[in-house]
């Protein structure tokens, strides 16, 4: 694995990487002075962005973790300072679009070796204060190789394996096309729901919002600073996807009186084909447990599973009614783990079934 990783930009994902690997790898944090002052527990060395003559030499991996436009400008900085290096240095990034970044990165001169990257992990929260070393566990890490590389270099494979992520190769143009449909346009649809809701509903009835509205508007809380660059660097694909989504919404609106069964069936089929869990690379096996409305009820369900060595991959408290109880959704990697969990919970008087 790499001996020293330089993280340029120190937000949620950079902080999460640092938290996960710091015991095995030396971490250099490159960011603004104000961020560096607050990140003392997550790195070993600290440099401001313009101190490139000190943070560039001696790095095994330079991972660009800032917003997309800053990633692109940092690649220019690396190119201008290649003379500072005496040996090969790998450069990668975590940007949410890939074509513009990879076009720049693949053109870096030796001794740089650039591989485009995009970990399919994150949160509507931002800032390294919310760092989570397990955020990459079982999540895809998409990567783009230049023509002169046949496979992902071994040190990068070791890093991704240590983080628990699942590397998947993809071409930069395929990446941006897919992300427009699966991430970027959905972000705008979520934003349109949250921003376009009736002011009367906001004023008088918003407290009635159920899980459907909350789920669909969750990502509307995302950072504009990050999304501004995404929209600018993937405009063509997003425009196409958003236009077709909008066209379908109008089509559904026009069919309100004539029946929407076929659309519902197609939507059901697409939804059910998704792997369960947060960007997981394989389906998870779900168990639904009924828990009472009393202090410690969640722990009473989870502690026996931990005692038996059964590892949870995902958990969600779905519904709670005061005085009645709630529904706890548990997800497991294997069917055997799910079946064992059901038996353990049932033996302790907690009704549980597979979902």
Where are the model-predicted features located?
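Internal alpha-helical scaffold of NAD(P)-dependent oxidoreductase catalytic cores
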Residues: 135-221
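Interdomain hinge/lid region at the active-site interface
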Residues: 202-268, 287, 294
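A conserved regulatory-domain signal marking ACT and ACT-like small-molecule sensing domains
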Residues: 270-355
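Rossmann-like NAD(P)-binding element
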Residues: 52-86, 90
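Glycine-rich, N-terminal phosphate-binding loop of Rossmann-like dinucleotide-binding domains
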Residues: 65-67, 95, 145
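Rossmann-like NAD(P)(H) cofactor-binding subdomain of soluble oxidoreductases
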Residues: 74-129
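NAD(P)+-binding Rossmann beta1-loop-alpha1 motif at the extreme N-terminus of oxidoreductases
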Residues: 1-54, 61
